[in-house]
Amino acid sequence: MEKITLAPISAVEGTINLPGSKSLSNRALLLAALAKGTTKVTNLLDSDDIRHMLNALKALGVRYQLSDDKTICEIEGLGGAFNIQNNLSLFLGNAGTAMRPLTAALCLKGKTESEIILTGEPRMKERPILHLVDALRQAGADIRYLENEGYPPLAIRNKGIKGGKVKIDGSISSQFLTALLMSTPLAENDTEIEIIGELVSKPYIDITLAMMRDFGVKVENHHYQKFQVKGNQSYISPNKYLVEGDASSASYFLAAGAIKGKVKVTGIGKNSIQGDRLFADVLEKMGAKITWGEDFIQAEYAELNGIDMDMNHIPDAAMTIATTALFANGETVIRNIYNWRVKETDRLTAMATELRKIGAEVEEGEDFIRIQPLPLNQFKHANIETYNDHRMAMCFSLIALSNTPVTILDPKCTAKTFPTFFNEFEKICLKN
């Protein structure tokens, strides 16, 4: 297995231009495909998850041109549902941001009735999709499970989404609601979506609604408890769509600045539509000096203190707080993060296991993690297992800010969202 060892870093300084957001990139591609008109998507992320979406769209008859550096994509919109001529099987890797929205979009009524199979890597077959499928079936969709009930692979017949009253469980993943919201404007009738349980990761729903507005569709949001979507609408191309820099990817660099220097990230700022921009607020609460601009966020070292906080609203960036916590005074508790368990790996168990290898004292709860800080001279050099999870690899790079090296196994797993991460990280590092 490939590995990379990061030597101890004495300080960090510099500016990082962020790659495009994964969440925004895949939403933009799908909305552009369903819209009337041609859309030029710029600052598109070049990563595995985006490639899976692009390959699927091509197989579904969407025509597009991708620039040589793969960051600009011009998409000819279909002006409605996918027009599939033959039965198809689409492989989506471990890309939840492709699997969930495509599951819903492929239920929309095509000119010719076809069956589409959606499948992926072994981990994808362990990632739940029951709540989305249940909701789509209530709206009249034809979906069946091919292996285990509640999990991909799925067989979908594009017979249409009728609409009507639909209940969806919001407690596991906001991507289920995102998928439903993006497809129901093209349903035959109006849809009223009622949320069961506590809706997790609300800022990701805000991203979805903002992007739908950019493509000409409005949704009535009643306090995140009920959503009303008019049927028989059309998405309209905005002609150009700029993908913001990835706020989750910003977290590693901002944390590094807060721990040991000064780092600025560009491509997101105070007006970003991404909830993970609020990661900077958490760092500020811990004591870091944060500066906000229109198109940048800067984090600067100050003594950090532990924090006890519900981080349901920033689940991806919250992982970075878990490794940052080792450098703070006092314990840190990250709460209400059950959905870590249904991500690329069971992130709660993975995080607790790998932090203990470094020497940290950690308590893993069903939906929380409690971390005690570690004196700089007590960090242990460990081989960090990444579980084919890009965020594990990137979070644990921060361990090199101690007096101890860290070895990251399978570093190329960052290709899911940030293939050049380790090169970019090295640019801000001053070695001991």
Curated annotation (Swiss-Prot):
Known partners and oligomeric status = Monomer.
Which HAMAP family does the entry mention?
Answer: EPSP_synth (MF_00210)
Q: Could you say which residues bind phosphoenolpyruvate here? A: 22, 96, 127, 175, 347, 391, 416
InterPro entries (alphabetical): Enolpyruvate_Tfrase_dom, Enolpyruvate_Tfrase_sf, EPSP_synthase, EPSP_synthase_CS, RNA3'P_cycl/enolpyr_Trfase_a/b
Q: In which pathway does it act?
A: Metabolic intermediate biosynthesis; chorismate biosynthesis; chorismate from D-erythrose 4-phosphate and phosphoenolpyruvate: step 6/7
Which superkingdom? Answer: Bacteria
Documented EC number(s): 2.5.1.19
The family note in this entry says:
Belongs to the EPSP synthase family.
The record, for NCBIfam families, names: aroA
Q: Name one GO cellular component term.
A: cytoplasm
Gene Ontology biological process terms in this record: amino acid biosynthetic process; aromatic amino acid family biosynthetic process; chorismate biosynthetic process
Single GO MF annotation: 3-phosphoshikimate 1-carboxyvinyltransferase activity
Task: Show the active-site residues.
Answer: 316
Q: Where in the cell is it found?
A: Cytoplasm
Protein name as catalogued: 3-phosphoshikimate 1-carboxyvinyltransferase
Quick check: keyword Amino-acid biosynthesis in the entry?
yes
CDD domains the UniProt entry points to: EPSP_synthase (cd01556)
Provide the binding site for 3-phosphoshikimate. Answer: 22-23, 27, 173-175, 201, 316, 339, 343
As its record notes, the protein acts as a catalyst of: 3-phosphoshikimate + phosphoenolpyruvate = 5-O-(1-carboxyvinyl)-3-phosphoshikimate + phosphate
